[in-house]
UniProtKB/Swiss-Prot annotation:
It is an enzyme of class 4 (lyase). GO terms for biological process: L-histidine biosynthetic process. It is found in: Cytoplasm. It comes from the Bacteria. Its EC number is 4.2.1.19. Keywords: Amino-acid biosynthesis, Cytoplasm, Histidine biosynthesis, Lyase. This is Imidazoleglycerol-phosphate dehydratase. One of its GO terms (molecular function) is imidazoleglycerol-phosphate dehydratase activity. Its main location: cytoplasm. Pfam families: IGPD. HAMAP family: HisB (MF_00076). Pathway: Amino-acid biosynthesis; L-histidine biosynthesis; L-histidine from 5-phospho-alpha-D-ribose 1-diphosphate: step 6/9. GO terms for cellular component: cytoplasm.
Length: 197
């Protein structure tokens, strides 16, 4: 089983993330940021990843530290769970629509962190959630999971739909990249022979 639990404590946040990459999509979230919980549930369900996230943060200031640090901790847990990456597909991609919105996410479990994020939300906030924090979440994830991630919202005029298509596509792309490829059994999917340097 490809599982990991990571706890990260700072003066700003206390976070524990547990995940199972070979799960059934069960999500449990206690972060104090309801819309982020809703989005992470999309990752779990569409990625078929069992994901448990508990966070206490300085929400009396705003959600910035909590959202960013959850991304960091999720990235650390993912890197631990995926291991040496032998026998996996490595690359994943997904297009996901929701009514008028359409997003594309492409991921490479390359060992090199990089985020290309092209999203123009039609509103600055979804409820009380500042949409700028999604970029912080994905930056945190990418920098600590050591993956290359391209996120493009291709169209949409409802910000909730824009965000939801991104997170659903991210879950599906992640699922594809993590899948075992029987023809690559025991082989690292790189001409370098490694994805860790």
């Amino acid at each position: 089983m490809r599982t990991a639990t990571v706890t990260r404590n700072t003066l700003e946040t206390q976070i524990t993330v547990s995940l199972n990459l070979d799960g059934t999509g069960v999500g449990r979230f206690e972060t104090g940021v309801p819309f982020l919980d809703h989005m992470m549930d999309q990752i779990a369900r569409h990625g078929l990843i069992d994901l448990d996230v508990k966070a206490v943060g300085d929400l009396h200031i705003d959600a910035h530290h909590t959202v960013e640090d959850i991304g960091i901790t999720l990235g650390q847990a993912f890197a631990k769970a995926i291991g040496d990456k032998k026998g996996i597909r490595r690359y994943g991609h997904a297009y996901v629509p929701l009514d008028e919105a359409l997003s594309r996410v492409v991921i490479d479990l390359s060992g090199r962190p990089g985020l290309v994020y092209n999203v123009d939300y039609t509103r600055a906030c979804i409820g009380q959630f500042d949409v700028d924090l999604f970029s912080e979440f994905f930056h945190g994830f990418v920098n600590h999971s050591m993956v290359t991630l391209h996120i493009d919202n291709l169209r949409g005029h409802n910000s909730h739909h824009q965000a939801e298509t991104i997170f659903k596509a991210f879950g599906r792309a992640l699922r594809m990249a993590c899948e075992h490829d029987e023809r690559m059994a025991g082989i690292t999917p790189s001409t370098k022979g490694t994805l860790s340097v």
